[in-house]
């Protein structure tokens, strides 16, 4: 007979969560979809003519962008011929230096690096992450918002956040025209708490850039990239337009990251039957190809999607590891709680 205590615990909402059945055709699978391409590359006269089983005649915008700018072609064929299990072991081996691995990982195709991390369990990925992170010292970011967009409260909370040790602070707005007030309040409050804190205001991208140009923010992060072409074009974007936006920030010396996360293509309905991790790998390669120094990923606000299927959280850690392995600063993010989706 089961005790009443365990019956009561089992009925709690937190214990009602469980995995749902994978839906491969719609990309509702975290890792190793049968529709994921096999790793391959062919280079003719310094140009990629085949990428992950797809000839250049069938490339979409993302394939073209990655093939031209995202892969170190000097060692690509050598690395693609290496055993993926051996490469996975090198990633988590503390005796193999990061400086030895980055030239290899940056010469892989998206499908190859996904194959490599798919051989690793969570503990091995954690060990690899300690070694592969691009940032010298890990740090924390805080969100500073309130329901009424009250700039005085934002400034006060920002000061406390800075005093408590947060090196980056982000705010956003419900009404776009309030953005300058929120951005300035966050900037002033954070510097009162502790000089040197970086601040951002998450908005529609043109407005966000304008705030940076005016000096109201110190950096930007919410410049979204996606792993399939239909999701890009649905937002009137291409990898090239995102690259142009990145160069606009760079022209004023503003730090910026792209943002992506596994599950976004599933939510938008354009996953093309690929796994969430493979599509996220394409996002990471777009970031590398655009010359951006870092990426906010880790499923972010889509976390309820990968966490609902088997190996979902493992895939989220894997995308963070891929980001760091491509020598990008990884801002690991989870903006939502799994049980709220």
At which residue positions do the language-model features occur?
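Anaerobic metallocofactor- and corrinoid-dependent redox/one-carbon enzyme cores
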Residues: 1-157, 163, 168-341
């Amino acid at each position: 007979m089961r005790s009443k205590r365990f019956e009561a615990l089992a009925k709690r909402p937190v214990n009602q969560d469980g995995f749902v059945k994978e839906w491969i055709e719609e990309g509702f699978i975290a890792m190793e979809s049968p529709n994921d391409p096999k790793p391959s590359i062919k280079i003719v006269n310094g140009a990629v003519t085949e990428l992950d089983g797809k000839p250049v005649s069938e490339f979409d915008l993302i394939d073209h962008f990655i093939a031209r700018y995202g892969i170190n072609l000097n060692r690509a064929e050598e690395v693609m011929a290496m055993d993926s299990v051996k490469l996975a072991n090198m990633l988590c081996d503390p005796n193999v230096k990061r400086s030895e691995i980055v030239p290899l990982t940056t010469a892989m195709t998206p499908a190859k690096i996904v194959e490599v991390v798919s051989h690793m369990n969570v503990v091995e990925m954690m060990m690899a992450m300690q070694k592969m992170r691009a940032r010298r010292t890990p740090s924390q970011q805080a969100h500073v918002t309130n329901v009424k967009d009250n700039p005085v409260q934002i400034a006060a909370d920002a000061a406390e956040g800075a005093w408590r040790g947060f090196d980056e602070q982000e705010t956003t707005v419900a009404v776009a025209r309030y953005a300058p007030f929120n951005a300035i309040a966050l900037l002033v409050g954070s510097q009162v708490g502790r000089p040197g804190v970086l601040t951002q205001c998450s908005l529609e991208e043109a407005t966000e850039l304008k705030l940076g140009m005016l000096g109201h923010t110190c950096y930007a992060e919410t410049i979204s990239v996606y792993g399939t072409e239909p999701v890009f074009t649905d937002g009137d974007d291409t990898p090239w337009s995102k690259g142009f936006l990145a160069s606009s920030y760079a022209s004023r010396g503003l730090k910026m990251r792209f943002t992506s996360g596994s599950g976004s293509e599933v939510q938008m309905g354009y996953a093309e039957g690929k796994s969430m991790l493979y599509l996220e790998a394409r996002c990471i390669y777009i970031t590398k190809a655009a010359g951006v120094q870092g990426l906010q990923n880790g499923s972010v606000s889509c976390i309820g999607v990968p966490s609902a299927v088997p190996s979902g959280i493992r895939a989220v850690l894997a995308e963070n590891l891929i980001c760091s392995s491509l020598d990008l600063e990884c801002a690991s993010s989870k903006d939502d709680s799994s049980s709220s989706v």
